[in-house]
Amino acid sequence: MRRVVAGAFALGLVVVACADPFAVEPRQAAGPVIAAVGDIACKSLPNDHERRCRYNRVAEAIREMAPDAFLALGDLQYLHGAYEDFIAYYDRYFADLKDITHPVPGNHETYTLYAEGYYRYFGARAHPPGGWYSFGLGSWHLVALNSQLCKGSTWTPELGQRAPITTSPAIDKGCGPGTPEYEWLKKDLVTHPARCTLAFMHHPLFGSEPYPEGVFLYQLQPLYELLDEQGVDVVLAGHEHNYQRFAPMDAFGHADPDGLRLFIVGTGGDTYGDLPEGEVATNREAAQDRSFGVLRMVLGDDEYSFEFVSAPGEREF
């Protein structure tokens, strides 16, 4: 279940092995293709603004990849994840991808009570009431997590109160040991001891932003610890509106060749999120904040290849 990277620390194509610690030459893996990105649709139609609302280009990039699965990494419809906004904006460009979409909710989806717009739009694909689930793709095991549950509730401006964030109030209890999501994840990973495993959620445990919500990140850490303990290879997240790739590390941010490799792919077309100038996050291998685009991964039997693909009309990296 573990991995060693091969290739340069660039945004281009590299291959990683899930098991034995040996390097291979940069090349394309053979297997199912996934596209992954979050932080997508503005509450307005696409435009040519320099920094925002170009999610139509991202949808086009995904279609050109013809992936077997699209992992939608949360904050899919701004500002509040209302069902009417999903229909008016997100659906206009992503409807034909719905049958291959595997979504997770972000914080903006949960600004509507019980994330009603998100669960209504995606239906069974969102796996209510909790929003966590797993599935197989090729030889890989993929796990979708609801990281917003780690807060236990979310601030909803319209309601002026803390509001539940799933369709079942009984589930809004956080994500640490003893909670429904944590215990489900623990059992799922033991039940599916795949050679290669990928987890995806909206929130990254590490990144570039100086989060003001440290308590929330503390609550999120148990999920990452469990993923690391169970030998998960890759974690995909969004939330920060840029692209970042990290070297393997443990759940405390320490470099570890047997740790989790984290990708942050918040380049779905809503807005750019500036990376702090002159600051390099610990263990970060690559990053960019000036191109909307998609992470393309090929999931081989014992390895995977990955590359960041800029959307049509965006700056190439």
Predicted feature residues:
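Short, solvent-exposed aromatic-acidic interface loops
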Residues: 307-316
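N-terminal active-site segment of His-dependent metallophosphoesterases
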Residues: 22-85, 180, 187, 208
